[in-house]
Regions:
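A fold-wide structural signal in alpha/beta-hydrolase
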Residues: 66, 95-99
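Short beta-strand-to-loop junctions in surface cap/lid or active-site-entrance loops
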Residues: 52-63, 218-223
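Gly/Ala-rich beta-loop-alpha elbow adjacent to hydrolase catalytic centers
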Residues: 140, 144, 148
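Alpha/beta hydrolase fold serine-hydrolase catalytic domain that processes acyl esters and thioesters
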Residues: 134, 149-295
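Catalytic nucleophile-loop/oxyanion-hole region of alpha/beta-hydrolase
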Residues: 79-80, 86-87, 99-135, 273-279
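Short beta-strand element of the alpha/beta-hydrolase
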Residues: 64-73
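A glycine/proline-hinged amphipathic helix-loop "lid/cap" segment
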Residues: 1-58, 295
Length: 295
C-alpha cells in the first residue's frame, strides 16, 4: 500500500490489530514464557511493590548513569523480554545501568496500579548500588512511553527521584484519542482504534471524574518543571497526532524537546522492521540523544 515508508517493503500482511480481547491471554502467556526463558540469565531485583525488575549493568563499578525503560503492550500486556536487546545495547554502548520493570496490566489492575509500580521501580533505581541518582532517565515504548511521561509528571509532583531526561518512543499519551473520529484502519498497522479504545477503557475503569495527567499525560495542565525530552513517532501511527501535540506543548512551555517524526512509519515499526535502514537510523538517534543527556 502506498504511503508507508519504502524501507519497510510489503506491509500488506502485517496485522492492523496485534492483539484482541479474545487473544489477550495467549499473548500474555507467550510473552511470559519468553520472559522466563530469557530472564533466567538476567540480574533480577524486586521493588517495594513486589514487582520484578530486570537489571543490566555496564562494566566498572560506577557510579553510572541509569535508564528506567518501560516495555510496551497497550497497558494490557507485555514483558521486559521485548526490550532485552535494547537494554543490553544501552548498557554496553552508553555505559548506563538499565532497569526493565514489570508492572500491572489492565483491565484486571487498572490505574493507578501500573504507574505506581513504575514509580516504585524508579525509587529502587535511584537507590541502587552503582547508580548516579543525578543522572537518571526514564523512557519506554508505546504504553511504556506513556507511563514514562506520566512518571516524569508524578516524580515532579511528589518531589521524588530526580529525572534528567525522558525518552519517549511512540508513546501512548491521550485517552481522548478513543473519542475522536477514527482514522482509516487501512492506513495503520499493529495498533488500531478498536483495541486502543478497549485498552483505555480498561485502564481507566476506576477513574471517577476528570482523568489525571498521571493516567493520561496529555491531560497535563502545567508542563513547567518536567525534564527535557526526546520524542519520536511515525506518521502512520494512531498516536501520531497526540504525540506531536504533546511534544509541541512541552516545547511551548520552554522544555527542550527533540521531536523526531518518521514519515510513513506505523506503530511498532522499529521492532517489526528492525533491520530497515529507517528503523536503524531511528534507534541510533534515540541512543545518541540518551548518551548526550546522561554523559
Amino acid at each position: 500500500m502506498s504511503g508507508f515508508h519504502p524501507d519497510f517493503g510489503n506491509v500488506d500482511r502485517l496485522t492492523k490489530q496485534a492483539v484482541r480481547p479474545g487473544t489477550l491471554r495467549v499473548y500474555r502467556f507467550l510473552l511470559a514464557l519468553g520472559g522466563w526463558l530469557v530472564g533466567r540469565r538476567v540480574e533480577q531485583a524486586v521493588s517495594s511493590r513486589g514487582r520484578r525488575i530486570w537489571v543490566y549493568r555496564p562494566e566498572g563499578d560506577g557510579p553510572h548513569p541509569a535508564l528506567l525503560w518501560l516495555h510496551g503492550g497497550g497497558l494490557i500486556f507485555g514483558n521486559p523480554v521485548t526490550e532485552h536487546d535494547f537494554a543490553r545495547q544501552v548498557a554496553a554502548e552508553i555505559g548506563a545501568v538499565v532497569a526493565l520493570p514489570t508492572y500491572a496490566f489492565a483491565p484486571e489492575r487498572p490505574y493507578p496500579a501500573g504507574i505506581e509500580d513504575a514509580y516504585a521501580a524508579l525509587e529502587w533505581l535511584a537507590a541502587a548500588p552503582g547508580v548516579d541518582p543525578a543522572r537518571i532517565a526514564v523512557g519506554g515504548d508505546s504504553a511504556g512511553g506513556g507511563l514514562a511521561a506520566a512518571l516524569a509528571i508524578m516524580a515532579r509532583d511528589r518531589g521524588g527521584p530526580a529525572i534528567r531526561f525522558q525518552l519517549l518512543h511512540e508513546p501512548m499519551l491521550d485517552e481522548a484519542t478513543r473519542t475522536r473520529p477514527a482514522p482509516d484502519p487501512e492506513t495503520m498497522r499493529m495498533w488500531n482504534p478498536a483495541i486502543n479504545t478497549w485498552a483505555w477503557d480498561g485502564y481507566l475503569r476506576d477513574v471517577d471524574g476528570p482523568v489525571p495527567a498521571t493516567a493520561s499525560p496529555s491531560r497535563l495542565a502545567e508542563p513547567a518543571g518536567l525534564p527535557r525530552a526526546w520524542i519520536g513517532v511515525g506518521t502512520r501511527d494512531l498516536f501520531h497526532a497526540e504525540v506531536r501535540d504533546y511534544a509541541g506543548r512541552l516545547a511551548a512551555a520552554g522544555i527542550p524537546v527533540d521531536f523526531h517524526e518518521v514519515e510513513g512509519a506505523f506503530h511498532g515499526f522499529a521492532a517489526v522492521r528492525k533491520d530497515a535502514p529507517v528503523s536503524k537510523d531511528y534507534v541510533a538517534r534515540m541512543k545518541a540523544a540518551l548518551a548526550a543527556a546522561l554523559n
